Amino acid sequence: QILCSVKGGVTMKIDLTEKQFRRLLDLVYVGNWVMNSTRGDDRIREYDDVESTVFANCLSHGMVPLVEAYQGELIPSRAFAEGGIHEAIMAYEDTMFFEILAQELALRDMDSDAPTPENVDELRERMDTYLGEFEQHGTDNITVEM
């Protein structure tokens, strides 16, 4: 059971198994990473606050190594951050990079700006060709002429 205090003094209780709570930590961390990792000093504090609130529950659930204090707040520990979560983020980013690149190149080849119901089959076929190339060779065969 995790407890989350909501503004106005209301406390929310969520019943989770230990395994579910551990997965929730991953989800919260990844969500905050997506929302804030590229923002520099312009972070969305509300997401940091949610992350801190959820990770604070590590203290009462035998997961102390996953949280640490920083500037008066509880944040995911270095042990948590180095425990494989960034490998999952990187795998997702790599997949998205190649999917987006394949779509952009396929649309370029088709002289189209966006997928439409009329071109979706051709687009998918061209994307699959590019994705096969990327799977075999990564970016080794990509050239840019300037």
PLM regions with names:
Residues C4, D26, A106-R108:
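Compositionally biased amphipathic helical and low-complexity segments enriched in hydrophobic
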Residues G9-S37:
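Short, extreme N-terminal segment that most often corresponds to the first beta-strand
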Residues Q1-T11:
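Short, Lys/Arg-enriched N-terminal segments with co-localized hydrophobic residues
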Residues R108-M146:
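Glycine-rich, aromatic-bearing surface loops/beta-hairpins
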Residues N32-A106:
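Structured domain cores in non-transmembrane regions
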